[in-house]
Amino acid sequence: MAKVPDMFEDLKNCYSENEEDSSSIDHLSLNQKSFYDVSYGPLHEGCMDQSVSLSISEISKTSKLTFKQSMVVVSTNGKVLKKRRLSLSQSITDNNLEAIANDSEEEIIKPRSAPFSFLSNMTYHFIRIIKHEFILNDTLNQTIIRANDQHLTAAAIHNLDEAVKFDMGAYTSSKDDTKVPVILRISKTQLYVSAQDEDQPVLLKEMPEINKTITGSETNFLFFWETHGTKNYFISVAHPNLFIATKHDNWVCLAKGLPSITDFQILENQA
């Protein structure tokens, strides 16, 4: 069984959003460190673990401050008490700070549960083809094959010449380098796997060449590739809770899980 290699050395050099933000702001760094650099005198022990309310004048003399993602309220020992995501262009005011400090409900922001509107508004840039002519098998040892001109299916086969061979192209986004977006193309063709809705078959769509930049409605061509040991998962960028899946006596589709099969083995060098 081929070992899934560590891929995307190219992605390790991607800059983070914080680095991009800090270079574009003259008087105030929005890196996480800047929230802790404000100098204050020591607090009494009884004040520990209480939220610290900061006014605009204490943070900066700049009259208007904008930021991209979120701000936090922390205790004096560094423990995060509350997180709040605001508008991309919303100014921070004293009222914002008071509302966050006094809000009894803590909002936990999880990058992996980013809403569709956020992911679909991101721009993905093509890096390179990272895998050539590999085969996908599900956990029932079924192999993905062509059902017709537009659809794929899974079946137990004896001749690997019947299997669909895929190429995998890697993309990156400056806004999120924690995931691995890829595009799947049938080898030696210009047919690309395209997602639809839940329980709907994935489609094979022809494009004259691989998209160098993908955004908006075109994200249905992208999938987040995740690996766990020898298991590989392909999560739709357009529908982040749905996986490429096989289903008994059905076409390859998008599904959340059982009874569909969402984990695959990649077989390389089968030409």
Curated annotation (Swiss-Prot):
Record's keyword terms, sorted: Acetylation, Cytokine, Cytoplasm, Glycoprotein, Inflammatory response, Mitogen, Nucleus, Phosphoprotein, Pyrogen, Secreted
Subcellular compartments: Nucleus; Cytoplasm; Secreted
Leader sequence segment: none
Domain of life: Eukaryota
TM annotation in the entry: none
One GO MF term: copper ion binding
Post-translational modification Phosphoserine, affected residues: 87
Protein name, UniProt field: Interleukin-1 alpha
